[in-house]
Amino acid sequence: MIFSVDKVRADFPVLSREVNGLPLAYLDSAASAQKPSQVIDAEAEFYRHGYAAVHRGIHTLSAQATEKMENVRKRASLFINARSAEELVFVRGTTEGINLVANSWGNSNVRAGDNIIISQMEHHANIVPWQMLCARVGAELRVIPLNPDGTLQLETLPTLFDEKTRLLAITHVSNVLGTENPLAEMITLAHQHGAKVLVDGAQAVMHHPVDVQALDCDFYVFSGHKLYGPTGIGILYVKEALLQEMPPWEGGGSMIATVSLSEGTTWTKAPWRFEAGTPNTGGIIGLGAALEYVSALGLNNIAEYEQNLMHYALSQLESVPDLTLYGPQNRLGVIAFNLGKHHAYDVGSFLDNYGIAVRTGHHCAMPLMAYYNVPAMCRASLAMYNTHEEVDRLVTGLQRIHRLLG
């Protein structure tokens, strides 16, 4: 299949609108991606003609809704090449998936004196749950430091592991710098020390294929809304043997086998014991449509187009005076920058006036901001529906802001 950005853009209704009298250039997909009509229509159709509560319903609508939900679990397992669909838990998103691991596996396996390793480039969602766990049990949080070019100081990693290391929690791709970490060697090293590995894949799965079996990670988590799917839905992958050992972290309906006031409660098997309550079935249906949409385009095709666009963007941005870029030359998805000494908020506001949507702030990565000694950055993210023309508009906009503000 030949990738056509024009055909892709035609599937996204929002891309035809104007902002401040100008065509929208949406360069904020790393925060949340726009949704194609196929996803919007699939979710709407479910609510119009197929909605019912899932699990245990004997009527047709309930049975069909349950089947559709479980088919999405199967589709998602194929998307990341899991061994079994029963290794996948539906969660609200990456943040909940990481918290689930911290509160279920973490509470059962991390003790006083143990340690967990993260990196200085992590999103707060892959920092705070581990800080909370370490504070609860008296464990130590160790940090892989950054290099100025936005890569990790991997030479320090062997010195951080010891016999008390229980987990390496690492991002696949930095949400600020676009750095893709060398997971294979990091995971191998962790396993050599008897540690488990959790990968935050929120910024990776939309850019190229992910194979959890090849990676050999123990946990992999991502969100639907960054993958052109709905908000409020995500996937947590856990190796089957680990998942079956993990206790539930939330109680309620759908996750039990039996409930007795005198004899207590027993749990149903994984993954369903981690899905208490009524699930976001509409969101799950929408996620399935997003996975189908991206798979039909071909992630390798998407990767090739996006990499060419990224190379073009980095080349063109060299023409902007006083522009500071953060991160390595080889990157995925995002370009973080500051213009002179102007605050990122001001630069982003000017760009919005030109119809260009970028993200400004600390990007839920305050330790990374502290490393670069800045309060905030602008971040332009490139998705499969962005164009060379939109990159040109960004460059022209930044040049114009530089002339106006000096």
Curated annotation (Swiss-Prot):
HAMAP family: SufS_aminotrans_5. It comes from Escherichia coli (strain K12). It is found in: Cytoplasm. The modification N6-(pyridoxal phosphate)lysine is found at K226. This is Cysteine desulfurase. Displays a strong preference for selenocysteine as a substrate in vitro and is only very slightly active using cysteine. The interactions with SufE and the SufBCD complex act synergistically to enhance, up to 50-fold, its cysteine desulfurase activity. GO terms for molecular function: cysteine desulfurase activity; cysteine sulfinate desulfinase activity; hydrolase activity; protein homodimerization activity; pyridoxal phosphate binding; selenocysteine lyase activity. Belongs to the class-V pyridoxal-phosphate-dependent aminotransferase family. Csd subfamily. Keywords: Cytoplasm, Hydrolase, Lyase, Pyridoxal phosphate, Transferase.
